[in-house]
């Protein structure tokens, strides 16, 4: 039975320990990749690089999956980058979200790919395939990362050139970022590659 993402929060039971947030933007990059942003609760704290469980409201028990947070810890919204899995318990419905839809988010983020777990050094190498770039998207937009490393090297590999667009857009937007723009211009190296 398909999940209806249009259900208003007052029409379903909200599980304990869950925020109900609103989709603020959606961008489809390819037939298999998309990015979306949701509102951020004032009480939600996370460290750049962490992940959180998200789901969609429905009449039955919601299905939750772990998603890396692609936005930095200082951002006023929460960004996610996802693959579209046609028969995925969550992604088959999540890929259809639109601005204004509700998304469920557990209140406790977690993860170890965070700045305070990284030892300072000359270079930070970040190797990602596909949507695995999401936690690195968070880290390269965090000023703390640039305080710990002289050079950040982001290697992003996908099957086809079109699948690299999120990474290209991300790095291009860093130039205008008021917090890390100058640092990223001097220290961030982006190596996009394809396998086909």
Q: Language-model features: where?
A:
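Ferredoxin-reductase
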Residues: 4-101
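FNR/FR-type flavoprotein reductase catalytic core
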Residues: 89-196
């Amino acid at each position: 039975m398909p999940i209806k993402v249009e259900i208003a929060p007052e029409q379903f039971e909200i599980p304990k320990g869950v925020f109900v947030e609103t989709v603020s933007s959606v961008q489809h990059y390819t037939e298999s990749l998309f990015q979306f942003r949701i509102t951020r609760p004032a009480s939600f704290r996370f460290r750049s690089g962490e992940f959180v469980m998200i789901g969609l409201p429905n009449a039955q028990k919601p299905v939750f999956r772990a998603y890396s947070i692609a936005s930095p810890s200082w951002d006023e919204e929460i960004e996610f980058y996802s693959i579209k899995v046609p028969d995925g318990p969550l992604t088959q419905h999540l890929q259809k979200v639109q601005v204004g839809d509700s998304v469920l988010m557990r209140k406790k983020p977690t993860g170890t790919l965070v700045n305070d777990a990284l030892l300072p050094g000359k270079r930070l190498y970040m190797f990602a395939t596909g949507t695995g770039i999401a936690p690195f998207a968070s880290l390269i937009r965090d000023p703390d990362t640039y305080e710990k490393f002289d050079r950040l090297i982001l290697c992003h590999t996908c099957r086809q050139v079109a699948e690299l667009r999120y990474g290209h857009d991300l790095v291009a937007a860093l130039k205008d970022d008021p917090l890390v723009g100058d640092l990223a211009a001097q220290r961030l190296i982006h190596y996009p590659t394809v396998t086909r």
